[in-house]
Amino acid sequence: MKTTGGSEEQKRRAGEKAVEYVNDGDIVGLGTGSTAAAAIDALGDAVAAGYDIHGVPTSFATRDRAIEAGIPLTRIEAVDHIDVAIDGSDEINNNLTLIKGGGAAHAREKVIDATADQFIVVADESKLVETLSEPVPVSTLPMAQKPVKHRLDSLGATTTLRSATMKDGPVITDNGNIVFDCAFGHIENAEALAKSLAEIPGTVAHGLFVNLADVACIGTENGTNVYHGDQDQGQN
């Protein structure tokens, strides 16, 4: 589920820093969420300044935001590669392992983020933690709801079917699936848990992003901290 915290200014700083990794002519994966939206706005400014880029959106909401920002769009089926993906995170540790899916777009996000030559994570400093502990979203085929929940419970999760807020019934993703939010407490071995979740028949995608992110731009009150896969850190 979505976490709260972090100012709009921190998100703006993270988004603007991430756009520095985008070159003229790039195909850019466009993530979902409030900090990814800040990056989309910054990309829109780059387009207005003359950059020739095309975006590949990860959700209907992202598509609409990109159109408003003036970013030309394409579909992943229409390109043979993605140069850079910029996406947010609900929680991130120093190894750049992420929990995503607060916006229920993690299935599409994982495809696009993994396809990109470089995946840049944007977040405010409230999302940076030593140990991941947020509930892990698991998108599931509706017909597999009962057996998937049983398997998730057997892994030690406290499992909640995500409910819609503006209608009765569960949240339905852009791909027509339901979402379980799975609380495991402190996640000491994200790679092993990711493997176990992926092996459950009926799951479509889970929100653990392991060994995918190349760079994280973390907005702070004083600037932006940049983390790389080797855990080097800088501030701008």
Curated annotation (Swiss-Prot):
Substrate binds at residues 32-35, 87-90, 100-103, 127. The active site is at residue 109. InterPro entries: NagB/RpiA_transferase-like, Ribose5P_isomerase_typA_subgr, Ribose5P_isomerase_type_A. Pathway: Carbohydrate degradation; pentose phosphate pathway; D-ribose 5-phosphate from D-ribulose 5-phosphate (non-oxidative stage): step 1/1. It holds the Pfam family Rib_5-P_isom_A. It catalyses: aldehydo-D-ribose 5-phosphate = D-ribulose 5-phosphate. One of its GO terms (biological process) is D-ribose metabolic process. Keywords: Isomerase. The keyword Isomerase applies. It is an enzyme of class 5 (isomerase). One of its GO terms (cellular component) is cytosol. Its EC number is 5.3.1.6. The keyword Isomerase applies. Belongs to the ribose 5-phosphate isomerase family. Catalyzes the reversible conversion of ribose-5-phosphate to ribulose 5-phosphate. NCBIfam families: PRK00702.1, rpiA. HAMAP family: Rib_5P_isom_A (MF_00170). Homodimer. This is Ribose-5-phosphate isomerase A. It comes from Haloquadratum walsbyi (strain DSM 16790 / HBSQ001).
